[in-house]
Amino acid sequence: MKLNTKYHGLLEYDEKNIVVFRKGIPGFEHLKKFILVPAEENNLFYILHSIEDENIGIIVASPFDILKDYEFELNEDKTAELKIENMEDIFIVNTVTLNSVLENITINLKAPIVINIKENIGEQLILDKVEYPIKYPLFKGEVSC
């Protein structure tokens, strides 16, 4: 299948690669179906792109590429809701805020997107019990809130 996007050109994908977000993503609750594709320009980033609205693509990155000791716990209810049987079946990304100044590019470590790659379902979580910043600089080791 093909998706002609506004910012990322023509993206090709298989229907089996569609990730369903039953609750949508905060700010885009009306959109439920997305594909995750590597960004061509940079192997650090991915694009989580809606297949329901060709204008909506969210830049994301793996938090583990940024902060090696990033961790949080999924409770039993969330594990069941996302049908997670094995931790190897999940892929975690976080939203990135781009900026023309490299030092001002940030990643939101407070709200990871958890994707069950076996079941192709996902959800963005808000971490209550862990003190991660919403704006963590991608290209320097300092935290700014």
Swiss-Prot record:
Entry-linked InterPro entries: Flagellar_assembly_factor_FliW, Flagellar_assmbl_FliW_dom_sf
Keyword vocabulary terms for this entry: Bacterial flagellum biogenesis, Chaperone, Cytoplasm, Translation regulation
Cellular localization per UniProt: Cytoplasm
Gene Ontology annotations of biological process type: bacterial-type flagellum assembly; regulation of translation
Gene Ontology cellular-component terms listed: cytoplasm
Subunit structure and binding partners: Interacts with translational regulator CsrA and flagellin(s).
The family this protein is said to belong to: Belongs to the FliW family.
Function: Acts as an anti-CsrA protein, binds CsrA and prevents it from repressing translation of its target genes, one of which is flagellin. Binds to flagellin and participates in the assembly of the flagellum.
Name recorded for this polypeptide: Flagellar assembly factor FliW
Lineage, uppermost ranks: Bacteria, Bacillati, Bacillota, Clostridia, Eubacteriales
Gene name for this UniProt entry: fliW
